[in-house]
Amino acid sequence: MERRLHLRRLYRVGEHAMYAAYYQDGSGRNSMRAFMIVTLLLVAITMALSLAHALELPGKLRLKEATYKSVQAIYYPGFTIGGFAEIGGIIALAILLYLTPYPGARFWWTLAALVFLVAEHATYWLVTHPVNNFWMQDVAVSKPAATFFSMLRRKQSGDWKDLRDVWEASHVAKAGLAMLSLISITVAATFFAGSE
């Protein structure tokens, strides 16, 4: 047991020495700072897109079925492109977590940001996407879009209002999770700034 603790301490000392050497000349610190800014930007874009949907909720609840379905179809070109920022944010957070020394507050806040963003993305695939399949079933879309919307297709039944409520609630949940991710990575960035 003591031997394990000693080896663990040696590993931590070696790990910190590796990071210290990386930051010694300043170029590592500047690279890490630039990567942190890119990561913050990707997470902020993800949060902004989710928040945009959530903020439309009061107005969209007043729409009749035909108008609501028409409005749904206008989102997909822009928000599909914006989805790449979401994937980029998850990848960037994972890389940032790998590069962040453990243990430490910055590590835990970065981990929290990653967990929240992965949960936000999972909400899309498990809740939002199946309802998107329903909204898009009668809409003419490109072949790549048709392939995308056919993924995880489930038979949706019920009143359109029930599906609308699920879709809208999923976007409120996504906005909340993305906001928590953005707050977490921002806090992690303040620990990075304070380590100079």
Task: Specify the residue positions occupied by each region the protein language model found.
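Basic polycationic patches enriched in arginine
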Residues: 3-4, 8-12, 29
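Short hydrophobic alpha-helical segments enriched in small aliphatic residues
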Residues: 7, 17-20
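Membrane-interfacial loop-to-transmembrane-helix junctions in polytopic alpha-helical membrane proteins
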Residues: 27-34, 71-81, 102-109, 156, ...
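Interfacial segments of alpha-helical transmembrane regions
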Residues: 31-44, 95-121
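Interfacial loop at the N-terminal end of multi-pass membrane proteins
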Residues: 43-90, 132-164
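Core segments of transmembrane alpha-helices
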Residues: 85-95, 175-182
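Hydrophobic alpha-helical transmembrane segments of integral membrane proteins
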Residues: 114-135
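Juxtamembrane boundary at the C-terminal end of a transmembrane helix
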Residues: 189-196
